Amino acid sequence: VGSEMCIRDRYKGTAIGPVNVLKKSESLIKRVHVENVDEELKRLDKAKEKTLQQLARLYDKALKEVGKVNAEIFEVHQIMLEDEDYQDAIHNMICNENVNAEYAVSITGDNFADMFANMDDDYMRARSADVKDISNRLVSNLSGEEQPDWENTEPSIIVADDLTPSETVQMDKNKILAFVLVHGSANSHTACLLYTSPSPR
């Protein structure tokens, strides 16, 4: 938590308080040659099932906090995770290039995110962040790394480059005075969660 900031929002009013800057560590996913493709596909399937379970728990949490309509964000994530084109692209990369699942998921996620980002429709462009969120969670489960815990311990203004829906729903909204997102989109699922979260004031 850093210095104090004053935020004025034309929709919600003014927030004054300490600043909590959230920084994400960008880990490089290495390309590793694998001999046993079948084992790699099994790893992928196991990580996918774990990811689906996590998304189901996030849905339940969001359902209690922001209602069914906004909780459906995490049902959409489950559908996107199981999307045939997305899964086929990952499988094909593992099988055809003998690469590790983490690398295949990372590259496929980037490709699909770029595809959405270049679409003309604002809503579809905002889905780019959803693909990245899903892919990052899948990679974390493959590598055995825990997703970062963005627990805020005191009331503060949250400043971040961007937030994923899963990061947003895990925060204690009663300790958030305001959000400042550098690359946030008004059409993103994160924005939907922020706008419908209970006000701390």
Residue ranges and their predicted role:
Residues S3, R8-L193, S197, R201:
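Non-catalytic, soluble scaffold/interaction modules
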